[in-house]
A protein has these predicted regions:
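Vicinal oxygen chelate
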Residues: 2-6, 40-43, 50-108, 132-135, ...
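Extracellular structured ligand-interaction cores
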Residues: 32, 63, 124-126, 162, ...
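A short, polar/charged loop-to-alpha-helix boundary motif
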Residues: 118-126, 249-256
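Active-site acidic/histidine proton-transfer and metal-coordination neighborhood
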Residues: 108, 113, 117
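Short hydrophobic/aromatic beta-strand element in the GNAT-like acyltransferase core
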Residues: 32, 101-103, 111, 150, ...
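Core segments of cupin and vicinal oxygen chelate
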Residues: 1-43, 95, 128-173
Length: 256
């Protein structure tokens, strides 16, 4: 994230999120802001990070978008335009499907897909990442992370296939959308998008399962210095990073 205040205002005024909490770590020279549509202990949220003095980042070609479910895509797009936001795809049906969508960008260039959908407990509903081998990615997320394949769809006309992975139905939970573009085996990940965070009852057991299923542990399980929240981190076969956070420790962190 480049300009901290401007970006936070976009998320609250254009996307209707709430600033849930923020923390400044001057000794490490960064600031975090956590934004979403409900409390962190029960909702998927966005963590924005501002590194002191860094004004821009390279998003790369691998990260796709975040998905937000809204009642009326056209109305939301009008609001975003009125606030000075960037619309990169006007409202209309998705390629190869019937769902009404639009695409917008935040001030740092992150894309958001607005998805027309009825009332949902989880408006921040998707993260889309591109992968080089869809079958391999599906197998990894099923076996290493315990996700289920909710659905997949092949679009030969547009030369791509998607797979929706998650821990529950799409209309009630945030899901991971994996996209395979025909013939593309790898992507530039840039230096902007960092990771997804998932809660777990035991970071040590989680790390074992990930190792057994071909994941690379990039941070051994254990407490974080200073806050004592236990975490572990890994990368999937495509190099996408995920952090697993101890459930009880995380709830204690929110209480402080």
């Amino acid at each position: 994230m480049g300009v901290y205040r401007f970006t936070c205002r976009f998320y609250t005024e254009c996307l209707g999120m709430k600033l849930l909490r923020k923390r400044d770590i001057p000794e490490e020279r960064y600031t975090n802001a956590f934004l979403g549509y409900g409390p962190e202990d029960s909702h998927f949220v966005v963590e924005l990070t501002y590194n002191y003095g860094v004004e821009s980042y390279d998003i790369g070609t691998g990260f796709g978008h975040f998905g937000i479910a809204v009642d009326d895509v056209a109305k939301t797009v009008d609001l975003i335009k009125a606030k000075g936001g960037t619309v990169t795809r006007e409202p209309g049906p998705v390629k190869g499907g019937k769902s009404v969508i639009a695409f917008i960008e935040d001030p740092d260039g992150y894309k958001f897909e607005l998805i027309e959908r009825g009332p949902t407990p989880e408006p921040l509903c998707q993260v889309m990442l591109r992968v080089g081998d869809l079958d391999r990615a599906i197998s990894f997320y099923e076996k290493a992370f315990g996700m289920e394949l909710l659905r997949n769809r092949d679009n030969p006309e547009y030369k791509y296939t998607i797979a929706m992975m998650g821990y529950g139905p799409e209309d009630k939970n945030a899901v991971l959308e994996l996209t395979y573009n025909y013939g593309v085996k790898e992507y530039d990940k840039g230096n902007a998008y960092a990771q997804i965070a998932i809660s777990t009852d035991d970071v040590y057991k989680t790390a074992e399962v990930i190792r057994l299923n071909g994941g690379q542990i990039t941070r051994e399980p254990g407490p974080l210095p200073g806050i004592n929240t236990k975490i572990t981190a890994c990368t999937d076969p495509d190099g996408w990073k995920t952090v697993f956070v101890d459930n009880i420790d995380f709830l204690k962190e929110l209480e402080e």
